[in-house]
Each structure stands twice: as structure tokens, then as C-alpha cells.
Regions:
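Active-site recognition of the HExxH zinc-binding catalytic motif
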Residues: 66-78
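Metalloprotease/metallohydrolase-associated module, dominated by Zn2+-dependent proteases
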Residues: 1-63, 79-117
Length: 117
């Protein structure tokens, strides 16, 4: 399926409620045309963070979920831990493991493959 900003926003709202207790602020949602990165949490240039997804991949529900949760973990660490963490260090790794074992969500990307159109 083609990724849209509407899909990303709807899933963000759903996952924020389900997994993050609505602790994440609303961000802007965008799409980008490059294959790398698959998705990204963009730093604010206008005071607002944004999440963007690549349009070159054939997305499905599981890929969207796993990838968006990955970005939401980054956002959670920035907002709630007051750390500007965009790497995949120990805090990120521990949250990723929690999602893997508790919810069976591959936010760490260990088992994820991204098919192109």
C-alpha cells in the first residue's frame, strides 16, 4: 500500500493511546522520496518535530506499525526523558526490547524487511 500522511497520523494517534498513554505530543507528518532512511524523526526547524516515511516502499500494516513505533520511541525519549537522543543507544534498546517481548512489535528492526514497489 502507498503510505499517506493521513495513515501515519491515524496510526500515531492510535499507538500513542495504546502504548504511550497519550504522553507524546502531536507532530507533523510528511513523506519523502528517498529510500534511505525508511522513515525519520526530523528535528525542528520551525519549532515542531515531524515524522516522515519514504514513498518508495510497499507498506503494509505490520511495517507501518513497527516503523512508526520505532520513531515514537525516539520521540518518547526526547519528550519524556528530556534527552535529545536520536541514536540507538541503551535507553532506545531497552524500550525496543520491551515492545518486542511485551507486544511482539519489532521496533528494533531485527526481523523487518522493506519491499519496494
Amino acid at each position: 500500500m502507498e503510505i499517506t500522511t493521513r495513515i501515519i497520523k491515524e496510526r500515531f494517534i492510535e499507538y500513542n493511546e495504546r502504548y504511550f498513554n497519550n504522553q507524546l505530543p502531536m507532530v507533523d507528518f510528511r513523506r519523502h522520496r528517498t529510500s534511505c532512511p525508511v522513515a525519520r524523526l526530523n528535528t525542528p526547524n520551525n519549532g515542531h518535530l515531524s515524522i516522515s516515511f519514504s514513498t518508495v516502499y510497499n507498506w503494509n500494516d505490520k511495517l507501518i506499525r513497527d516503523t512508526l513505533i520505532h520513531k515514537m520511541i525516539h520521540l518518547y525519549l526526547v519528550v519524556n526523558k528530556k534527552e535529545w537522543i536520536f541514536d540507538h543507544g541503551i535507553p532506545f534498546f531497552l524500550m525496543g526490547l520491551k515492545f518486542l517481548f511485551k507486544y511482539h512489535i519489532d521496533a528494533l528492526g531485527w526481523f523487518t524487511r522493506y519491499p519496494r514497489f
